[in-house]
Amino acid sequence: MSTSGSRDSASTRESARETRAGPQALPLGSVVSLSSMRSASPTHAPWVAKPTTSVDLTNHFMEVAARGGEEERSLASPGEEMQYELAHSMKAAPALPRELPSPFRAAGGRGALPQEKQFFVLTAAGKPIYSMHGPEELVMGLMGIAHTLLNYFELDGPRERLRTITTYDAHGVLQRFAFLRKKHVVLLAMTTRNEAEAELQQQLDLLYSYLVSSLSLRQMSRLFERANFDLRSFLTESDFHNLDQLCRAMCDGTHLGWTLGALECITLKHSVRQRINSIMLRATRGLAVGTLLYGMIVAPDHRLVSVLRPKGHTLHTTDLQLLFSMVENQLQLLHSSQEVWVPLCFPKFNGNGFLYCYIKFLPTDTDSASNETTLEGNMHIKPTLILISPQKSSFYDLHTCASEILDNLAVAGIMPHITAPSRFTINDIPAPLVHHFIYKSKKYVQYVMPETSSTTDWSTLMKYYSHLRSNALDSHGNPLSENVVAFARWCASSGQVQVEYCDSSEELQVEDQPSSIFSESFVEESLNMTGLSWITPSFELYLLCNNGEIPKAVVMKSARNVVGWCSRNGHKLFVSEGAVF
């Protein structure tokens, strides 16, 4: 494909993704184009391939030996040269320590991208599409290695498809490489965090789903029919910005729902939620059949308030998470008087076509003040009303519907419940010595958690939750048994993590269960913390106790109290049905 043809295609797709404005006679707020919200993407310099033969993957890619000048490097063997590239692709900034500090207090600001993790996307033919960080000339060599490895393991057919490569040292897992191969693209994750294979595969699937949401499978197949097609020339600057934000969020652990495969809800009285549902249903009565496919009201930080859906149908959690990510990364600078009309492919719903999203932010008390939200990822995401249609000409109909919904919410005095929702606290639950927990309802595919302190380092806290979750799952992400309980204890003095499994029905026999030891390093000598994972067919519970020696029987009793409390208050904690039409 020629360069000019690629640019014309990109221009065509950009014009298709512009927001639609209506006739001047209709008194609308400003309808904003997504192209005006783009951020600069990394400069795409020509990629330089180097001849490679092999690389010693047993060496830690974060531990880089001191190198001399270019003359000394030119004398290195091909294997040593690629080991140098492997290491320096992760060294755009000084390496971060692997130690887990105290999970209860933040150490500082966001800082640079974590250098202990890397994501790559390349075509099935080995051409680079995206890398999270690292000099392009070094990343190119690493992508070449990944492509060679994948092809080698597929010599005997797809049944031998490579999924992970894990290296170990005396202290356990040193580094892990996870691969996800699709029809047209290959995705690779590299980490030193001892993350489970299933978690990495889930993250790669989210990146792939984003590409599909931006292009659609039909368009991707059509594009890759061209000889020597370079997908980078077709992706927009906002696409690369969104990929950066997705990767960074997965490294920081700021979006727990991506790991759990669930949505977070606000705590709301059942009667208030029912009034919201009634208001949404009344506003849809004037719409023609087929105009509205799905709708939702989302509180700050992407916490679900209610959904508007047809009977027997719903959207996949991944599709909604991609929609929320787009709103977070591209639209947060908009004022509540502005509206957006944007096409988006929902890969889990229908990867071959686009749906059309009407997006409007709800008015808040801060609208009159200076807007401090930036595209760099402010955690306070604005409350939003989203209506989704299969018809690209339905903007005016959905605008009328949205206006009626917002007006009636304001008249009913419900808006403060949405724009400034509160969380329950750990003190609301009779669970002694529990510091924090995450409870997921498998029936509703939603989760809740108590309020945390403003000084909590959420990224570090998520590392503990990730460890707890991996203890209860196998390499494919399935529970070790139908009803599994796993205890974990972090002890800084011994530098070890003790994990014990038991049957949840045997509350008083947990002390006699066999244990296995996993190594991990810690910074604070006073750390002595217990955690629990409890997975059943109906719920998942991940619980962290206060620092100190706590008997497992006490932890189990508190866990049962948490489960009982969440079950009794499910009508407040979760969106059970929503507004069904």
Curated annotation (Swiss-Prot):
Keywords: Autophagy, Endosome, Membrane, Protein transport, Transport, Vacuole. It is a peripheral membrane protein. Residues 1-28 are annotated as: Disordered. Its main location: membrane. It is found in: Endosome, Multivesicular body membrane; Prevacuolar compartment membrane; Vacuole membrane. Residues 10-20 have a biased composition (Basic and acidic residues). Belongs to the MON1/SAND family. This is Vacuolar fusion protein MON1. It comes from Eremothecium gossypii (strain ATCC 10895 / CBS 109.51 / FGSC 9923 / NRRL Y-1056).
